[in-house]
Amino acid sequence: MPAQPHKQAVTDASHLYEVERRARHCERPGFRITEIQLSPTQTVPWHTHTNVSDTFYVLEGEMRLFVQNPKEAIALKPGQSYAVAPGRPHLVTNAGARSMTFLVLQGVGEYDYVPMV
């Protein structure tokens, strides 16, 4: 059964899931760049964004990105990227045995994080 949107969108999702490290490198109206490090057991849970796309760029480790509409599983290694369109549900996992570090470029538009249930 596909994930369904939760009713409450938030503008700061940092308290909703654990990461090893999170650093904001750039934030301007309608655009931001964040570096995130996940341990092998951590995930960024199913969610979507109303207005912004997420472009993932892997720096270290291996990422597994799951998306819906249509359903896909994308494997990314260092130097590879993938863009998720606004409104497309997605989940990020560490596919390796060591920490994985990636950049996420979010924009252009007003940021929100819509958890899925």
Task: Please provide the spans of the model-predicted regions.
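Short acidic-glycine-tyrosine-enriched beta hairpin
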Residues: 70-86
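A short hydrophobic beta-strand segment most commonly corresponding to one strand
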Residues: 98-113
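Short, conserved beta-strand element in jelly-roll/cupin
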Residues: 37-39, 50-65, 105-107
